[in-house]
Amino acid sequence: MIGRKLFCFFAACMVESCQKSKVCEKMQIRTISPEETEAVGRKIAAKLLPGDIIAYYGDLGAGKTAFTRGLAAGLGVTEQVTSPTYTIVNEYLSGRMPLFHFDMYRLDSADDLFDIGWEDYLARGGVCAVEWSENVEEALSGAIRITISKDPADENVRTITIEGGERFANLGL
């Protein structure tokens, strides 16, 4: 179990798609350290499939790269994971499937995303983890949405909201 201050809840939310309604799962996890945030990433990694896209949402310094370090560890990545702020994408190929870690902070639209070869990365059968997803949201339909929020009262506390369907409903935390 992650930390004594961990809490989780599941909420059913209705999503309209093609005039059919589907139930999706939403889970919130509270962590009290970067290590706990990484541990949640490791748990998520165990459920990932080739071609999955993770769309991160959260302010600067919220813990998106820390979460990705855990994700990478859970995929068996042996390289050091760093923020792709200046490179736009970092590739990690040593795990059970490739991990492509994108930072879209400097991009203005999905058009920019396609200019850097987005479709080529998708075709490679790995996991795409996308920071600053709000900048390219229209290209990320069907993505697993992970929102990381800082607690204004405690700089170490994060609330991680995972929206990705039933596959992520039981993380064993």
Give the predicted meaning of each segment.
Residues 26-40:
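N-terminal pre-Walker A segment at the start of P-loop NTPase domains
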Residues 77-92:
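Short beta-strand-centered segment that lines the nucleotide-binding/catalytic pocket of NTP-utilizing
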Residues 64:
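Conserved lysine of the Walker
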Residues 54-56:
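Hydrophobic anchor at the beta1->P-loop junction of P-loop NTPases
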Residues 27, 73, 111-113, 119-173:
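Short phosphate-coordinating micro-motif centered on Lys-Gly-acidic
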Residues 61:
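Walker A (P-loop) phosphate-binding loop of P-loop NTPases
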